[in-house]
């Protein structure tokens, strides 16, 4: 019978044995507990931890990448105009590069500064609408936009919806961009052009900037957009020629981008524009060479901004460029003859400060531009960069 009870009785777990051991009085157990209690009493307390000064840098995990400087940190966007634009976009099913690319200036450009009324925000707001969906056929190593070889088909109502939304906001300047659509025969050029024409029909007073891809090098498709009635044609070279194969999708080349900008100007566009990211491994000599190439083809506007890694799946930041270096590139570019230069850590290709200046040129200098041309205005305009009358 005792044997049967032993079989039926569940075995004691190690934890139970451990408790039993501690519960059994013994000189060795008491000694261990006493030493442990003494260590707790004589050791550092909570006050000792929180009274110490916090070090400037706490090492956690991978520290190979440079630390984000304080001047690159931005506040959470808010405000009446910000909420209005966001609501309209959702209602019409439209996408913005501001959201898709996680732009740090979204609160600023959408009129989300604290204290701004809806009317004040709208008058200062600039939104960058992303056409042809939110999925790109290319995979640049710096970009956070979704990618696919077979994105969804185009929305035939998008040109009308976009024009309706823009005319409703009462903005003075709008930027249209798009994902790359290498799956389409025309790269989406006709869709892009139709959107511009509808905007100009519904709100002819609005100035339109088109930030396009390279249309796989097809200059005929560049012409379709360039001759649609837009005011500014933008195409970003993104980085210097030497780094282009490592930064951009393999189908994009530096020389191909130059041809796009050059052809847009030859097609009759008043102002051409491009953007360069700093902090991806470029040298000063390479940046200067890129600027000279841009001036050879009469590009009017250039912007400089800091590359910021969207996720850990994207290429690392090589370095964070100091604001003083951005100021230096602004001066260098102006001396090379660019009509306008926006340069700063948080500047992006469609940053509103540059648009205010371009809007002033296109509106206030319309007659002069018609008679003289952009290149002849460069000298007189540079003197008034800090005092713009809208």
Curated annotation (Swiss-Prot):
Q: Record's family?
A: Belongs to the radical SAM superfamily. Lipoyl synthase family.
Q: Enzyme group, top EC level?
A: transferase
Segments carrying the region annotation (Disordered) are 23-48
Gene Ontology terms: cellular component: mitochondrion
Top-rank taxon of the source lineage equals: Eukaryota
Chief subcellular location equals: mitochondrion
Keyword vocabulary terms for this entry: 4Fe-4S, Iron, Iron-sulfur, Metal-binding, Mitochondrion, S-adenosyl-L-methionine, Transferase, Transit peptide
Lineage runs: Eukaryota, Fungi, Dikarya, Basidiomycota, Agaricomycotina
Compartments annotated for it: namely:
Mitochondrion
Q: What is its EC number?
A: 2.8.1.8
Query: Which pathway is this protein assigned to?
Result: Protein modification; protein lipoylation via endogenous pathway; protein N(6)-(lipoyl)lysine from octanoyl-[acyl-carrier-protein]: step 2/2
Indicate what this protein is called per its UniProt record.
Lipoyl synthase, mitochondrial
Q: Which residues bind [4Fe-4S] cluster 1?
A: 98, 103, 109, 350
InterPro entries this protein is in? Answer: Aldolase_TIM, Elp3/MiaA/NifB-like_rSAM, LIAS_N, Lipoyl_synth, rSAM
Keyword 4Fe-4S included in the entry's annotation: yes
Matches recorded under SUPFAM superfamilies? Radical SAM enzymes
Which Pfam family name is an example for this entry? Radical_SAM
Q: Say which species the protein is native to.
A: Laccaria bicolor (strain S238N-H82 / ATCC MYA-4686)
Start and end of every Radical SAM core domain?
Answer: 119-339
């Amino acid at each position: 019978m005792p044997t049967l009870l032993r079989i039926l009785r569940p075995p004691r777990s190690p934890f139970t044995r451990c408790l039993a051991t501690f519960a059994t009085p013994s000189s060795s157990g008491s000694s261990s507990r006493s030493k442990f209690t003494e260590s707790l009493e004589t050791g550092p307390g909570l006050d000792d931890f929180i009274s110490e000064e916090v070090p400037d840098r706490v090492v956690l995990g991978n520290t190979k990448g440079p630390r984000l400087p304080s001047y690159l940190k931005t506040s959470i966007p808010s405000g009446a105009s910000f909420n209005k634009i966001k609501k309209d976009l959702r209602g019409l099913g439209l996408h913005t590069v501001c959201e898709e690319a996680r732009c740090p200036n979204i609160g600023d450009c959408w009129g989300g500064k604290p204290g701004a009324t809806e009317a004040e925000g709208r008058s200062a707001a600039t939104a960058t609408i992303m056409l042809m969906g939110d999925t790109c056929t290319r995979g640049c190593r710096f970009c956070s936009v979704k990618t696919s070889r077979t994105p969804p088909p185009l929305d035939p109502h998008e040109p009308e919806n976009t024009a309706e939304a823009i005319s409703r906001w009462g903005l003075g300047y709008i930027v249209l961009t798009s994902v790359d659509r290498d799956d389409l025969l025309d790269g989406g050029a006709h869709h892009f052009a139709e959107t511009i024409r509808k905007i100009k029909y519904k709100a002819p007073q609005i100035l339109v900037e088109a930030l396009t891809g390279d249309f796989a090098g097809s200059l005929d498709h560049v012409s379709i957009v360039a001759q649609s009635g837009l005011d500014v044609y933008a195409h970003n070279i993104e980085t210097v020629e030497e780094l282009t194969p490592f930064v951009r999708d393999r189908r994009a080349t530096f020389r191909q981008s130059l041809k796009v900008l050059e052809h847009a100007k030859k097609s009759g566009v008043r102002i051409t524009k491009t953007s360069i990211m700093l902090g991806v491994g470029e040298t000063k000599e390479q940046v200067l060479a890129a600027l000279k190439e841009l001036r050879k083809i009469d590009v009017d506007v250039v912007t400089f901004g800091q590359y910021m890694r969207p996720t850990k799946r994207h290429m690392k930041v090589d370095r964070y460029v100091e604001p003083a270096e951005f100021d230096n590139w602004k001066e260098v570019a102006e001396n090379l003859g660019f009509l306008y230069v926006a340069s700063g850590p948080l500047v992006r290709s469609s940053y509103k400060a540059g648009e205010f200046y371009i809007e002033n040129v296109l509106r206030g200098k319309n007659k002069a531009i018609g008679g003289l041309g952009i290149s002849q205005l460069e000298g007189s305009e540079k003197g008034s960069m800090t005092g713009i009358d809208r």
